[in-house]
């Protein structure tokens, strides 16, 4: 799930009810949805699970800086993925600045908590497609609530895309 740190809006999501599929395999889909939603993205933040060479390279190829906390036993060997070296070098060069940026990712945990508190635990559905639909609807409902708050508190009028009726 991609989440903006300023307004806590969900910018991209990839939902798979099959728990045998890991989060990292769903990263590209959510990431490219986020890029379409936020073309002026500056950084990409994530848990240590995303600190793999191919993911850091994917992010770097889109001219963005990845901030994924690497494990303690990693090396600078890029093994063909230049984004890996760039991320580790930026951490080595200025650890305080890097960690300051990285810890903005806690906002995504806040959003997960907000959704759970507002909408409760997942329903006990047997059909996998309904589980995915439930998750997507909760995320959309979260964004609608957040946009309502943004309109009121920040006096911002969002531009809703409108389709012509035929």
Where are these regions (language model features)?
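Polybasic low-complexity intrinsically disordered regions
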Residues: 1-48, 53-61
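Hydrophobic side chains in beta-strands
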Residues: 3-4, 68, 142
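A generic secondary-structure boundary signal that marks alpha-helix termini
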Residues: 36, 75, 146-149
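Helix-centered, glycine/charged polyanion-binding patches within enzymatic domains
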Residues: 49-117
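Basic, amphipathic alpha-helical segments enriched in Lys/Arg and hydrophobic/aromatic residues
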Residues: 96-166
């Amino acid at each position: 799930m991609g989440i903006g740190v300023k307004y806590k809006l969900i910018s991209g999501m990839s939902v798979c009810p099959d728990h045998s599929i890991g989060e990292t395999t769903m990263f590209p889909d959510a990431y490219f949805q986020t890029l379409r939603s936020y073309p002026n993205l500056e950084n990409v933040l994530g848990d240590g699970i995303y600190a793999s060479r191919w993911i850091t390279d994917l992010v770097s190829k889109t001219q963005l800086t990845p901030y994924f906390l690497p494990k303690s036993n990693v090396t600078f060997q890029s093994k063909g993925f230049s984004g890996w070296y760039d991320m580790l070098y930026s951490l080595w060069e200025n650890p305080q600045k890097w960690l300051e940026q990285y810890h903005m990712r806690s906002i995504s945990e806040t959003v997960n908590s907000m959704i759970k508190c507002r909408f409760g635990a997942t329903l006990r559905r047997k059909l996998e497609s309904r589980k995915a639909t439930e998750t997507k609807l909760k995320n959309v409902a979260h964004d609608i609530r957040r946009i309502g708050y943004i309109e009121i508190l920040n006096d911002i009028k969002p531009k809703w895309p409108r389709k012509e009726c035929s």
